[in-house]
A protein has these predicted regions:
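Positively charged n-region of N-terminal signal peptides that target proteins for export
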Residues: 1-4
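Intrinsically disordered, low-complexity segments enriched in polar/charged small residues
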Residues: 7-9, 143-144
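Bacterial N-terminal signal peptides
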Residues: 8-20
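Divalent metal-binding segments
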Residues: 22-39, 44, 48-304, 323-374
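Acidic (Asp/Glu)-rich catalytic clusters
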Residues: 281-285, 307-316
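Short amphipathic
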Residues: 317-323
Length: 374
């Protein structure tokens, strides 16, 4: 996931409720005294009938007036905080409709393998050097976790137009497991040590909905794992950071979402342990924004039914279920109804990608969700 610095100021209150108030709709006599009033910059309402406003008033965590400065200032009381935007833009916060907040924290704390301008990795030698530099700069963390993680490479932007391999990662370390996460998070690359830890070998069969790529002319894994093959490996490797490490990922991920203007972050396809971790952090007051988890519809239905909620408690809720049907278009595993046009890599003619769930699983999940009101 690539990000760009955002210079806008974002309201973190419940912005969707009264943005529809048009200019001049603030009451002439204050029915409520505002806690805060913003003015002094462009205010975008996202309301087609009144796209811009001069001021916004908030009371009790809710927007109570949007309109002209003269009208909104009528809600000013002796303790109202006046906030001068100084030309900055004010707009409603973004709601994450498809994200993985723990993966965001993982990205923030891992070696940055993104291509320019977000990183410096344009070929595999640069990727390997970035890993070496990160290991040297984070020796204490590597020694503690016995795990090296890099995030954000994309074979389509590498000069070689391919994924790195286990043998190349072995030049960094043969003794400490290494896990690279593709920019889409649907692929990964493991070194030989990591492959051994997760139990993948020439005898391993591809899991349903995933692929273990092999060395040419053999069944030996070359380190590249697709979709559910990678997900299974990652779930076995990441616990090496310990529960405190996973908590750090969650906190840092939520902070990243907050910095870029989100008021709701998502943890998609969460497992129950992840959902419990997020609830624990929420109960401890760790989040400044709302976090919603959607749990795997194929494996954890009883947990979903028992724990889903339409309301947030301490800024967290389990919102329902997620069903993964196919992969990622970035890695050419997304399932298409027509062949990919010039996919980057070694793919057979007419390649369509592939599903990660059967038709029976999809229809059964839909029926279950409707019956359980998920």
């Amino acid at each position: 996931m690539r990000t760009r610095t955002c210079s806008t100021l974002v309201v973190t209150a419940l912005l969707g409720t009264i943005w529809g108030c048009a200019a001049g709709n603030a009451p002439s006599a204050p029915a409520v005294i505002a806690d805060r009033i913003w003015s002094g910059g462009p205010i975008l309402t996202m309301d087609d009938t009144a796209m811009r406003a001069e001021a916004v008033a908030e009371a009790g965590g809710k927007i109570v007036a949007v309109g002209s400065k003269a009208a909104v200032m009528k809600l000013q009381g002796p303790k109202t905080e006046l906030i001068d935007l100084k030309g900055r833009t004010l707009l409603p916060g973004f709601i994450d409709a498809h994200g993985h907040v723990l993966v965001g924290g993982l990205q923030a704390l891992s070696a940055n393998l993104l291509a320019p301008p977000d990183g410096n990795v344009s070929d595999i030698p640069a990727l390997l050097q970035t890993l070496r530099d990160w290991v040297a700069a984070n020796k204490a963390a590597v020694d503690k976790t016995q795990l090296i993680i890099g995030f954000g490479y994309d074979q389509a932007t590498l000069a070689e137009h391919r994924h790195p391999t286990r043998d190349e990662l072995d030049t960094i370390s043969k003794d400490i497991p290494i896990m690279l996460v593709h920019q889409s998070a649907h692929f990964g690359v493991l070194n030989s040590k990591a492959l051994g830890i997760v139990g993948l070998s020439a005898a391993s069969k591809d899991p349903a909905g995933g692929v273990i790529r092999r060395k040419d002319g053999s069944q030996e894994p070359n380190g590249v794992l697709e979709e559910l093959a990678f997900a299974g490996a990652a779930f076995k490797l990441l616990p090496r950071v310990g529960p405190n490490g996973m908590e750090v990922f969650a906190r840092e991920g939520a902070k990243m979402w907050t910095r870029y203007g989100y008021t709701t972050a998502e943890e998609g396809k969460a497992i129950p342990d992840t959902a419990r971790l997020l609830k624990k952090l929420a109960d401890e007051g760790s989040f400044d924004i709302d976090v919603v988890a959607y749990v795997d519809a194929l494996s954890d239905r009883d947990f979903i039914v028992a724990n889903q909620s339409r309301t947030y408690t301490n800024r967290f809720r389990i919102g329902g279920a997620k069903l993964t049907i196919d992969g990622a278009l970035q890695g050419f595993t997304g399932w298409r109804d027509r062949p990919y046009y010039k996919p980057v890599g070694d793919f057979p003619p007419g390649y369509l990608g592939y599903p990660s769930a059967t038709a029976d699983q999809v229809f059964d999940s839909a029926r279950w969700a409707a019956e359980q009101k998920v």
